[in-house]
Amino acid sequence: MDKKTQAVTEIYAKSLVEVALERDSVPIIYDEVRAILSVLDDQQVQDFLASKAIDLSAKSEVVRLFQESCSNYMKQFLEIILQNERQQLLYLIMKEVLKELSLKTHIFDIEVTTAVALSDDQKERLTALVEKKFALTKRNLIEKIDDEIIGGFIIKANNKVIDTSIRSQLQELKMNLK
């Protein structure tokens, strides 16, 4: 993404986040953004909105479909995007909104990768560790199973990583032996 596109997406995202914070509607906006992103995660939808060959009115119709089940704040926000002909940036803007919401509220998704599934007790202890270590609050715990890490875990939250996996320890040992 070029600097101009990044700047535009940040401006739009920050404006929606500001409204969400002022109006105490962060959970609603968060849920709506996640719902919109669940549709926009489809590359075909992104390509449709970005295509110069497709008429602007057709793109607007697709974006207006999101408005049917959204709060007034999101409806107005989407309308501004349509008026400014920024439909092609909708996916990037929504991703940036999630990032900004997390930064402002210190509430993040925590991704945990383990070799085997975690018990409920382990999840609770891990969540407490991450919240304390990273000074954040958990929104969702996203669990991934990867038997290639052999043992231990890899935690990712707020662009930070704790890697205690056996695989990484073996790789580190290998590097030290060279």
Curated annotation (Swiss-Prot):
Bilayer disposition of the protein: Peripheral membrane protein
A GO term, aspect molecular function: proton-transporting ATP synthase activity, rotational mechanism
InterPro entries: ATP_synth_OSCP/delta_N_sf (IPR026015), ATPase_OSCP/dsu (IPR000711)
Localization (cell): Cell membrane
Disulfide bonds: none
Domain of life, per lineage: Bacteria
UniProt keyword terms in alphabetical order: ATP synthesis, Cell membrane, CF(1), Hydrogen ion transport, Ion transport, Membrane, Transport
Coiled-coil ranges (or none): none
Pfam families given in the database record: OSCP
Gene3D superfamilies: N-terminal domain of the delta subunit of the F1F0-ATP synthase (1.10.520.20)
Quaternary structure, from the entry: F-type ATPases have 2 components, F(1) - the catalytic core - and F(0) - the membrane proton channel. F(1) has five subunits: alpha(3), beta(3), gamma(1), delta(1), epsilon(1). F(0) has three main subunits: a(1), b(2) and c(10-14). The alpha and beta chains form an alternating ring which encloses part of the gamma chain. F(1) is attached to F(0) by a central stalk formed by the gamma and epsilon chains, while a peripheral stalk is formed by the delta and b chains.
Homology family: Belongs to the ATPase delta chain family.
Protein name per Swiss-Prot or TrEMBL: ATP synthase subunit delta
Source organism of the structure: Streptococcus mutans serotype c (strain ATCC 700610 / UA159)
